[in-house]
């Protein structure tokens, strides 16, 4: 049987969200040496500037030393652009999410924010290979700007995309909508169905959000699922390992 990989991905990582994640991360660490992918927001909702939070940066330094990966995740993680003008844009920016920061941005503004994020990683000597847009939404301008950064990958809920040409790598992801009890119940059913469908997938990602950690039902599900997938023989890894391997195969 081919090797099957598993990635544990924490979205919306910021000083404000760390108290949500901390008990879960401690429980994961207690299971052994399990690498985690941290989607780091440089200034979450304009009130969490990483440059102002030395203790949190030291935490991230420590996670890198453990073998974790830090990934750039937007800049503000907030959609502050003018109101949408078309039905499609209204749906994407007001129904699907209110946090699709890079969906309405021009190429120029996208490039500016991407460069600021890259410079933050450089300033703190954090290796950087990937960018994941808030809510996985990249508008046309953002796609063009991201392709020119020199980063190696981005992703959406079902795929990695190798930059700069957005070549596709299948990587199904399990993600919850946990803001209400009925959504949490439905998310569990959908997740189990998806897991059965992708049981033999070479790559499987678990995409967690801070809101998942605020409810015992969803938090325990993620911990139990991680334990179950490890017992099923999946090997935990980080995004860059998978993407680097895929890029190598494409070249040779």
State the predicted function of each range.
Residues 12-20, 42-55, 78, 82, ...:
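Acidic-and-aromatic substrate-binding clefts and catalytic sites of carbohydrate-active enzymes
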Residues 84-105:
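Active-site gating loops and adjacent loop-to-helix segments of metal-dependent hydrolytic enzymes
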Residues 1-69:
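Active-site beta->alpha N-cap acidic-glycine motif
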Residues 69-88:
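Short, solvent-exposed beta-strand-terminating loops
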Residues 167-217:
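A conserved mid-domain beta-alpha-beta active-site/ligand-binding segment of alpha/beta enzyme cores
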Residues 103-176, 214, 219:
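Catalytic domains of cell-wall/extracellular-matrix polysaccharide-remodeling enzymes
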Residues 35-40, 153, 203, 208-252:
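C-terminal domain-boundary segment and adjacent tail
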Residues 6-10, 36-38, 70-73, 128-131, ...:
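Hydrophobic faces of well-ordered beta-strands that scaffold small-molecule active sites
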